[in-house]
Every structure is written in structure tokens, then in C-alpha cells.
Regions:
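Boundary/junction segments of secreted and surface-exposed precursor proteins
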Residues: 20-28
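C-terminal cell-surface anchoring/sorting signal
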Residues: 1-19, 230-247
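Short, aromatic/His-centered strand-loop micro-motif at the edge of beta-sheets
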Residues: 128-152
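Extracellular beta-strand elements of beta-rich domains used
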Residues: 29, 215-219
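Flexible glycan-contacting loops in extracellular carbohydrate-active proteins
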Residues: 178-212
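Extracellular glycan-recognition surfaces and repeat-rich motifs
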Residues: 32-64
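Carbohydrate-binding surfaces in secreted/extracellular proteins
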Residues: 29, 84-86, 147-182
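Secretory/extracellular carbohydrate-interaction modules
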Residues: 58-125
Length: 247
């Protein structure tokens, strides 16, 4: 008969192994906000979930830029795809210009990356290497997007080549290549095992305020087989409980 300490050791081993990999997730914002999300900075900029989208707005001035972030804590042990779909209800793009930036960021142990789309329709990709390098790896490039459009951004990291393929699509259309290659100093490195974040930043004094809705956001590793530790813990403990009942 196995002793209780043996069960505890097995549970700890299973849980510990799960915490080594990057935390994956997929959220379509169809229900209450998952507790894993962190609502940060400008409280009034967080509009909450409505019609399957998480809304954000912003005011001009210090601290008036809301951020929605989520931990991805773990180790970069495989390729991954980080993707987000956003509806730009009111932003600019030739309409009433809100003089704002939409920022999509990911942070890791070796650096961070961010996509910045301004209200004129120019998008750029920035990479910072914690060893010292930092700058745009894709400069401001005008993309065809308008108020009311659904914009999907996808960052696919290849662990073997240490490169990324970054694409975007509008209203469910075919993906369009935006950038393919390495980082500011060559390799991309780990830019995704700390947290991911969306920020809306209003930099101008325009009377018009930005209004966006995050429709879908996911982070998947190759094979998409790494559940979060809480899920593994539940499965592990349930299995150990059944083993104990059989004794």
C-alpha cells in the first residue's frame, strides 16, 4: 500500500513539471472575464465585456492608458503562435482621428516585442533585446484598415530557427505578411515567458476618444498540448484520489 507521502510526492512532481512550460490560453471573451487577466492603469478605460468583446478606451494624459495583461510564466521550450483579434469601433484611419496608439506587447526573459498601430493606419514592429539592442524591425507601414474592421494579428515563433513570421488579416481575409526574420541583433530570443499585454494610448488632444473591442486572444505552443498548471493539478489529484480509493 502506498503511503500518503508518496501521493503527495507524485502530485508535486506532476504539478512541478507543468510549471516548466509556457502557459497557453485561448479566450473569446464570451463570458465573465477570466481571473487570469489583469486590468491595469486607467480604471475608466476598462469597459468590460459586451457582445463577446472586451472594450477599452482612453483619455489623454499621464496614467490614462488602460492595459489588459496576462501572465505566461514558464520556460520557452517550443515554438508558439500568439494571436489577437480586435475590432476598432472608433479609432481614426481616415475618419475622426482619436490621435491614439494600439499596442500589443509580449515580454520574456531575454527581451520584449510590441506592435504599435496608430490612428493614421501606420503599423510598426519593435524588438528590444535585453543585451542592449532595441529598435523597429519593421518600420511604420500603412495597412488597409478602417473604423469597424476586425484586425487579426499573429506572431508565429519558430524555436528551431529563432525567428518569427508576423502576419495580419482584416475581417477574416487571407493573412498578409508583415515581417519575417530575426530580431534587432539577430536572434529573437525569449520574448514571451513573462506576460502579454494590450494597451490603448491616447497621445493627442483630439476630442475623439478611441474605442476598441478585443474579440479573441490566444497563445498556443506547437502541438497545443500544454494546459495551465491549475488544470494539470486537478487532473493529477483526481487520478491520485482514484488510485487511493482502489486500495
Amino acid at each position: 500500500m502506498k503511503r500518503p507521502t508518496t501521493y503527495a510526492f507524485l502530485a508535486a512532481s506532476l504539478l512541478g513539471s507543468s510549471q516548466g512550460a509556457i502557459l497557453t490560453f485561448s479566450d473569446d471573451f464570451s463570458g465573465p472575464l477570466d481571473e487570469a487577466w489583469r486590468q491595469q492603469s486607467f480604471e475608466g478605460g476598462h469597459l468590460g465585456i459586451s457582445d463577446g468583446k472586451y472594450g477599452l478606451t482612453a483619455n489623454q494624459g499621464g496614467g490614462s492608458n488602460p492595459k489588459l495583461s496576462r501572465s505566461t510564466a514558464g520556460e520557452l521550450d517550443s515554438s508558439y503562435v500568439n494571436s489577437v483579434s480586435v475590432v476598432f469601433n472608433e479609432f481614426g484611419f481616415g475618419g475622426d482621428n482619436t490621435q491614439s496608439d494600439f499596442k500589443w506587447k509580449n515580454f520574456g526573459s531575454e527581451g520584449f516585442m510590441e506592435v504599435v498601430l496608430n490612428s493614421f493606419g501606420d503599423m510598426r514592429l519593435f524588438h528590444n533585446d535585453f543585451d542592449g539592442g532595441g529598435g523597429n524591425i519593421q518600420p511604420n507601414t500603412r495597412i488597409a484598415v478602417a473604423n469597424g474592421d476586425l484586425l487579426t494579428l499573429s506572431n508565429a515563433y519558430n524555436a528551431t530557427s529563432d525567428t518569427i513570421d508576423f502576419t495580419y488579416s482584416v475581417n477574416g481575409g487571407d493573412p498578409i505578411s508583415f515581417y519575417s526574420g530575426g530580431g534587432i541583433d539577430g536572434p529573437i530570443g525569449d520574448t514571451n515567458t513573462n506576460f502579454v499585454e494590450v494597451e490603448v494610448f491616447k497621445w493627442g488632444a483630439s476630442e475623439f476618444k478611441p474605442n476598441i473591442g478585443i474579440d479573441d486572444w490566444s497563445l498556443k505552443t506547437s502541438g497545443d498540448a500544454v494546459p495551465e498548471p491549475s488544470s494539470i493539478a486537478l487532473v493529477s489529484l483526481a487520478g491520485l484520489f482514484l488510485l487511493h480509493r482502489r486500495k
